[in-house]
Amino acid sequence: MAGRARATMKDVAALAGVSPKTVSNVVTGTVFVRPETVERVEAAMTELHFVPNLSARGLRNGRSGTIAVALPDLATPYSAELLHDLVEVAHERGLAVQVEETGAEPGREVELLSRARAHLIDGLILNPIRVEDSAVEYADHLPPVVLIGEVEQRVTDHVIVDSRAASRDITRHVISRGARRIAAIGGDENPEKETAASRLRLDGYRDALRDAGIEPDPRLEINPLPWTTPSAAAAVDGLIASGVEFDAVVAFTDTLALGVLHSLATHGKRVPDDVLVTGFDDVEMARFSSPALTTIGFDLRRVAEEALSLLNRRMTERTAPARSVTVPYELIVRASTGD
C-alpha cells in the first residue's frame, strides 16, 4: 500500500485558514506575522507532519537556511543560557543553527567567516573576546556577521550591554553597604590577560571607587585565567594568604563569584557579615548559591532577538550602515550583599 502523500504548504494553509504566502512567512521568519496566526500555522504543520524544505527555499532565495553561532567557551553557564535563547529564537524564525566554539582563537573565526563567504552558512553571530585580535577587525568584504559582547568596534552590527556602567553601579552598591576595601576578581593591569569584558568592568569598578573618594589598590585587582570557578577560588585563597584586607569582592562573572563564595566559606568568612560578594550575568545558579548572589542581570532572550534581527537585516541589506543595539541591564540585589 502506498504511503501517505507528503503534506505541502498549500495543505498547511488550507488547514490553518491562511494563504500559502502566510505559511511561507511563518517558515522563513522574515516577515512579521501575528502571534495568533503563527500559532494556527504551527499547529497545522504539526498535525500534518509538515517539514519545510529548507534546501528548496535556499535555491529560490540564495540562502542555505543555516546560520552559525560561535562563542569562546561553550562550557560556561552564561554561554549555555545564551546559546539556548539564540537557538530557540533562530528556530522560531525558520533557521537552523550550527554551533561553534572558537576558544578565543582568531584562526577559528577566519574559518567561520570564510565558510559564510562561500555561502555554506547565511551568516554568523560571533562573540569575540578581544576585537583587536579578532578576524572581524581585519576582514575585508565581511559576510553577514553580528557581534555580541563587550567588544568596541564600528566594523559590523553589534549587540552589547553597557558593562562599564553596570560594573560601576554594582560597585557603588557595595560601597553604599559600607564596603571600602573592595577586591575586583576578573581584571588587572596585565595587557596579556585583558579582554574587552575585563577592561570595561575594571574601568567601571575604578569609576565607582574614585567617585566615592577611594583610591584603587592594585593588590585588590586580580584577573585569574581562565575565568572559572576554581581559578577564582584559588585567587581569593591567595588574597587571604597575602594578608591584604578586604571587606567586599566584586567578581566580573557569576562563575567567578561562585569560586569566591567557596573560598570565603573554606576560610570561615561569612557572607555578607564579613565580606560582601557580587557577580555579573545573573545565570541560573546565581539564584541558588548560598547565599543567593547579588548580580547584574539582563535579558538574554532580548540579546538573541536583537542579534537575529540585525543578522536578518544584514543578510537582506548588505550595504546598510553598521548598527549597535544596547540591551538594558538591572542590579539584582540578593543575600550576598545583605538584602
Residue ranges and their predicted role:
Residues 19, 65, 122, 179-181, ...:
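Short acidic/polar active-site loop segments enriched in Thr and Asp
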Residues 59, 73, 104, 130, ...:
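Conserved beta-strand edge residues that scaffold enzyme active sites
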Residues 1-66, 338:
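N-terminal helix-turn-helix DNA-binding module of bacterial transcription factors
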Residues 11, 29, 105, 162-163, ...:
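Acidic/polar helix N-cap motif
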Residues 1-2, 47, 88-93, 144-147, ...:
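Bacterial carbohydrate/catabolite-sensing allosteric modules
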